[in-house]
């Protein structure tokens, strides 16, 4: 790896991760993988199940329009932080039952509900979450029996809203 790096055929992204280098003449720069690609490779390398986390879930679900400058993901692995090209990537450990054997959209929905919290879940936000939940493949009644009570209640409200449309 060291020799290939010295030759310029590959470049080290971070400890243990390398990429083939591509030079783009038009912009006179090297091409590097996106943060999302690096996140996926880290998850693959450590065999983690991951899903979007933090403030980004609120943006992704349509609850908020703020964009975080830190890339936060929930995972079934340990909590870790990495720096990639000046950007912080943070993996936060979460209970496996929220992300294992579930769709990534369902995991994002759960994370968004947790991020908002019990006290700040008012009707407008629940309706936005319900709109997002239309694309979730899990049954919000049957597939949520092992989820924390207050989160399950929110999911049942979301299911009710979507059924009444």
Can you say where each PLM-predicted feature lies in the sequence?
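Hydrophobic alpha-helical interaction segments
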Residues: 93-165
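Short gly/ser-rich loop at a beta-strand->alpha-helix junction or flexible surface loop bordering the NTP-binding
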Residues: 12-16, 39-84
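Hydrophobic/aromatic-lined pockets within catalytic cores
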Residues: 9, 62, 114
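Short beta-edge/loop segments at beta->alpha junctions of small alpha/beta modules
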Residues: 1-42
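A short, charged helix-loop
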Residues: 83-93
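Alpha-helix boundary/capping detector
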Residues: 26-31, 44, 83-85, 135
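Alpha-helix initiation and capping sites
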Residues: 29-36, 47-52, 103
């Amino acid at each position: 790896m060291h020799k290939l790096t010295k030759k310029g055929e590959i470049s080290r992204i971070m400890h243990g991760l390398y990429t083939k280098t591509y030079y783009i003449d038009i912009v006179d720069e090297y091409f590097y993988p996106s943060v999302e690609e690096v996140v996926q490779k880290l998850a693959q390398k450590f065999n983690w199940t991951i899903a979007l986390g933090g403030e980004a879930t609120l943006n992704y679900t349509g609850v908020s329009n703020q964009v975080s400058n830190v890339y936060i993901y929930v995972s079934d692995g340990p909590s870790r932080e990495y720096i990639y090209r000046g950007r912080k990537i943070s993996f936060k450990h979460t209970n496996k039952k929220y992300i294992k054997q579930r769709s990534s959209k369902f995991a994002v929905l759960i994370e968004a509900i947790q991020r908002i919290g019990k006290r700040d879940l008012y009707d407008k936000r629940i309706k936005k979450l319900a709109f997002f939940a239309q694309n979730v493949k899990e049954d919000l009644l049957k597939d949520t029996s092992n989820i924390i009570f207050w989160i399950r209640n929110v999911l049942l409200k979301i299911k009710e809203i979507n059924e009444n449309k």
